[in-house]
Amino acid sequence: MAEKIDINRIQRDMFIEYKGEPYRVVDYDHVKPGKGQAFVRVKAKNMNTGNAIEITYKSSDSIELADFEQVFAEFSYKDADEYHFLTQNTHEMISINAEDIKEEAKFLKEGMTVVVFIYKNKPIGIELPKAVELEVIETDPGFKGDTAAGGSKPAKLETGAVIQVPFFINEGDIVKVDTRTGQYLERLDRAQKK
């Protein structure tokens, strides 16, 4: 049976069960109105469907933690409709439906270590590292003077994702990208690339 905790102990990225479905807490807010009882507003993402919902709890409620297993695995390959990962401890192959991780797949490349979420013996999602280093394979060339005004341009990365980068970024550059927001963080020297 899953563990229950007081709603006031809720945290971001915590896994909870709501109406028999697994959710990941995206955000929460403790609200104390002038009149009436305090409550907690929780924004959560359904780990099966990817849909986000808002749930309101009384401050006296308790929530059920979802019974997730988290496994470190290395991305091996993708076929027509599944991504395949090799677990680090047991060296078992785990397959996940491409639809279940379509957002994360934008920044996924072979050999990358991720966390695979398993719920009731079924892999249902992954968590990427917070930032990844990827090569720019296609972008318009920068011109002198473009950097003075700031601004950005689209760039296609080696994984196929398209992000906005500063004008001084060129094809072949290695950039660090925040996987949660898809935002450019910095350009790396080739010597810095791991």
Swiss-Prot record:
GO terms for biological process: peptide biosynthetic process. This is Elongation factor P. Gene3D superfamilies: 2.30.30.30, Nucleic acid-binding proteins. Coiled coil: none annotated. GO terms for cellular component: cytoplasm. NCBIfam families: efp, PRK00529.1. The keyword Nucleus does not apply. Pathway: Protein biosynthesis; polypeptide chain elongation. One of its GO terms (molecular function) is translation elongation factor activity. Involved in peptide bond synthesis. Stimulates efficient translation and peptide-bond synthesis on native or reconstituted 70S ribosomes in vitro. Probably functions indirectly by altering the affinity of the ribosome for aminoacyl-tRNA, thus increasing their reactivity as acceptors for peptidyl transferase. Belongs to the elongation factor P family. InterPro entries: Elong-fact-P_C (IPR015365), NA-bd_OB-fold (IPR012340), Rib_uL2_dom2 (IPR014722), Transl_elong_fac_P/YeiP (IPR020599), Transl_elong_KOW-like (IPR013185), Transl_elong_P/YeiP_cen (IPR001059), Transl_elong_P/YeiP_CS (IPR013852), Transl_elongation_fac_P (IPR011768). Disulfide bonds: none annotated. HAMAP family: EF_P. CDD domains: S1_EF-P_repeat_1, S1_EF-P_repeat_2. It holds the Pfam family EFP. SMART domains: EFP, Elong-fact-P_C. It comes from Hydrogenobaculum sp. (strain Y04AAS1). Keywords: Cytoplasm, Elongation factor, Protein biosynthesis. SUPFAM superfamilies: Nucleic acid-binding proteins, Translation proteins SH3-like domain. It is found in: Cytoplasm. The keyword S-adenosyl-L-methionine does not apply.
